[in-house]
Amino acid sequence: MFHFFLKYHFFLFISMAPRYYLTLSQVCSQVWCNKYTIAFVLLAVKVYTFSLILRSTLDHLMDLVDTINVSLDQFASTATNFPAQLTQLTNKLIAEQLQQLKSNFKLSLLLLVSVIRALIGFYMEIFLGTFTCLLDAAAQASVNFALDSAQATLKCLNTTIVSVTSEVESGLESISSFIENSINTVSSLFTNGKKPSVTSINLSLGKLRNLQIPGSVTNELDSFRLNLDEFDNLKNSTINLLTAPLTHFDKNVSGSDLFGPIDSSKMVVANYGPSAAKNVTFDLTEVKNSIVDFKNDAAKIASIMIIVLASLSVIAMIALVFVERRNFVKRDIFVISVREKSSPLAIGNALETYQNRTIYYMAKLKVNPRYYWICNYLTSKYAMVVIIIGLVGVISFTLQYRLLLSVKNKLKNLIDTVSSPEQTKQLQASLSQYTAQTNNYIEAQSKALNQNLLGWYMKASTNVNDTLTDILHQINSTIHTVTGNTALSKPFEVVVYCVIGRKIVAVTKGITWLNEHLVIDLPQLPVDLFKDVTEAAPLRYGKQLETQMVKATNSLEHMLFIELYVALGFVGIWVIFIVMGIIFMFFPKKRTIGSPKLLTKTEKEEYIFPLSSFNTSSSVYSTLNDRPIS
């Protein structure tokens, strides 16, 4: 309470002193240095310096783009000349490899043909030769037995026939004499001694004396035995027919120019030179122009922010002029109110209303007076310094971060432009000529091998296949010729099909499968051979640019967030003031005071205290304990 008495005494004192307060014009001469204007000016300076840092970063990125452009041009030049240099180095190696491949393939084919030819003779000997041998043995044994039996039987039969014929003829002669005598006797009885008309009766075998079984039967058996040699002829002719195409193929392969030496200088790929490739240069001018546009946009945004902040500072100065003018009006009102008030508490409240604008406006708005104290506590000069610094820091962060984001989002699009520029596709198209020419040459070699080499094999295998098909017909025809319509014909044909025919059918199927699948397919270069190479360098440089960009933006972001954290720290202190104010408001410190000391005569005169006698007992002042203590 003594504090309020001092304030009251002070105002009384200055009322009798000469004027030393500033007039309105004098205050307005310094209003341009108000804290709001200074804050806005500092924000403008901060935005300007940050824009300079950002533009310097963009200049560094633009220099990096120039370096990347030069590196990409060197890469394009090297990549364009690489196929020609590679051709000169590898043509001889390719020719040697193709020559070795052809030689090895030729040797393999000759060995394969020799093996097939030997296997054909081996299988024909196994199947047809074995069957012929068995058939010949069986037939020879049967014919020899039949021939020997027929000769013995014919000899015996002919001897028996001759003996029987002689005996029959002798008996017939006796019978003939008897009959003739009988006829003569009877005839003389009936003819009166005349001579009979039948002179003689001759009973004989006549030509039957020479009756014998002809020897042609044994001749036919000999012919059957000799015809068995047809199976040997069939076997030999079959082997010759089957191996004839292979022999022809062997001669063609051995004498072909296809397997001759390859001249690497005459290879089609050797004609590929630097002039064959399209000259490709990387031009990142568009990227540089984009960065320049970003710089201009950043400068434009920074200029707008600075202009806005400068305008706000001017507005703050103008507003404060009106505020100061109102303060003088409020001062007059305060002086009048102080004259009318005698209570120190009322004088103190009037003084705070004059000094604190927040309470002044709350009073004008007729806000509940119970909230005046907490507003006064939170808007004191110490609390306002904290919250203003915090808010200025937050606003500064917002403006600078907005400026950084405007550039950062646009820079991300440049990474794709550098990582996969249009020139990469042109370079790939240029280098694909080398791949196409090389693949055409390899394909031509494959066609030559398939036509000139495997064409002979196809023809030979087709002839072998056709010959195998005719074998069964020849075997059946030979069996029919040998056995004729005998009972051995059908069994022999069945045995031949089971022993030989089924194998021949399997062989023909195998040859047909080989004809369909035997194709020389030399490996070719991948179509995208240079794709990874041409894309790797732009991707690497794009990654380098991205790394530098991210590093720069992250550094700026880190700096801005440090400012934000500091500003939020000041705001946090002001929040602590809020908590402390709530504690003070709802938990006031209670204390008990004693009776006030009596004023001396001099003090009474200074404070214009009434000097009349009055009760100064402590009971009079005991009611002060119930008054609010400031």
Curated annotation (Swiss-Prot):
The chain crosses the membrane at residues 38-58, 109-129, 303-323, 377-397, 567-587. Belongs to the PRM1 family. The keyword Phosphoprotein does not apply. The keyword Isomerase does not apply. It is found in: Cell membrane. Glycans are attached at N158, N202, N236, N252, N279, N465, N476. The lineage of its organism: Eukaryota, Fungi, Dikarya, Ascomycota, Saccharomycotina. GO terms for biological process: plasma membrane fusion involved in cytogamy. The gene is PRM1. PANTHER family: PLASMA MEMBRANE FUSION PROTEIN PRM1. This is Plasma membrane fusion protein PRM1. Involved in cell fusion during mating by stabilizing the plasma membrane fusion event.
